[in-house]
Design a protein with these regions (language model features):
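Conserved glycine-rich beta-strand-loop-beta hairpin in the small C-terminal domain of fold type I
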Residues: 101
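C-terminal nucleotide
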Residues: 1-93, 104-133
């Protein structure tokens, strides 16, 4: 795993308020998106149990897309996520309450994790950490 700090403090309270407003404005869209996030979570649990890192990475990527649809991502987080993908991450997504905070990326091996870490820093991450799982 590679974890990157965006340098932006997360804004959970604001993110929750934005999603609540979006749910009032576009209830069908928000319900579909929330259902898709729930399905990603179930499938991610299965991928973890089966040791399927490729599927887990794909689901992380989908999850980030859905979080972006809920408007809890930021251009800075999106840039860090994109840099991880381009550097070969199996998947990447924001983590935490949204509107700042950290990004988590999944690498298939240690060398790749270092390349992903460098790419994330070049994309604006203040600090990165790698962790074997």
């Amino acid at each position: 795993l590679v974890i990157a700090d965006s340098g932006q403090a997360g804004q959970t309270k604001r993110a929750v308020a934005q999603v609540a407003q979006l749910a009032q404005d576009r209830p069908d869209q928000v319900m579909k998106t929330m259902a898709a996030i729930g399905e990603c979570t179930i499938q991610a649990q299965q991928a973890i149990r089966q040791g399927d890192l490729v599927a887990l990475g794909r689901l992380m990527t989908y999850n980030h897309y859905y979080l972006n649809q809920l408007k809890v991502s930021t251009p800075e987080l999106d840039s860090i996520v994109k840099s991880a993908w381009l550097a070969g991450a199996l998947g990447a997504k924001l983590t935490g309450g949204g509107l700042g905070g950290c990004v988590i990326a999944l690498a298939s091996q240690a060398q790749q994790a270092e390349a992903i870490s460098q790419a994330m820093r070049q994309a604006g991450a203040g600090r990165t950490w790698t962790m074997a799982i």
